[in-house]
Amino acid sequence: MDLYNEINSLCIELEHSIKSLHENGVNYAEAYKNYRVLLSKELLRLKTNGMPVTIAYDIARGRKEVADAKFEELSTEAIYKANLENINALKLRIKVLENQYDKEWGNTNGW
């Protein structure tokens, strides 16, 4: 029954990871939105002040507030993607243990 308990434990962990995916996704979307808004405002300001369009984008991205927002976006994206990878790894571990459980207990019908 150790396999059964381990499978149940992983299923619970998977449920928690799926629930946290929503929160991480919202955080990522919010960080992306904030970055895009700051970048747009800075580009508009630079264009209004006569900055050539060819370099305005690079200058805008170099402004501290915009760069900080981009850092936040990239950080939350990394957390979101790591959460997705964790979910996939948990699903794979569960599947491997289910197959092992089926072999040991002779269950050919699956769960």
Task: Label the model's feature ranges.
Residues 1-111:
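Charge-rich amphipathic alpha-helical interaction elements
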